[in-house]
């Protein structure tokens, strides 16, 4: 069993936002009515993105981007991919990304963002019997986080911790449950 510790997640980044990235705006705009827009997501952030019973990406973000496509008269396909590859795939593999993603200066140099439509906070999940209550309690510990996420960036900034990254968030949780982080 695990519990969430909000105190252990204190950081200089107070806000995160889910945002649609669209660096390939010119190419996407060139697609005529009836065309297909391909968006990437990382379906590991319910209720915003998850894999539905049919094996396809589902959730609020998927419904939102499909509604945008309908308004534009275009079909929208949503591909489930690794979170860390979303930004780099825009413009070649996908037309845009829709995912719970923090807007950072580094990302803004690579892609354009919509206005954020949801603000989230970062949490640290610890075992139920843990005595970790503050960021200081994380010294000399190993923190697991998903590659390319705000959680990864924050864990790298905490003095005295070892940051362990994972392609999928569930793998970090599994290692926590099994005592590896």
Language-model features and meaning:
Residues 2, 6-9, 13-57, 70, ...:
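Immediate post-signal peptide segment of exported/extracytoplasmic ligand-binding proteins
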Residues 75-137:
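Acidic, polar ligand-binding/catalytic clefts
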Residues 73-76, 94-95, 140-141, 161-162, ...:
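Loop/turn elements at helix/coil->beta-strand transitions in domains of secreted/extracellular proteins
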Residues 130-131, 147-153:
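Short, polar loop motifs at secondary-structure junctions
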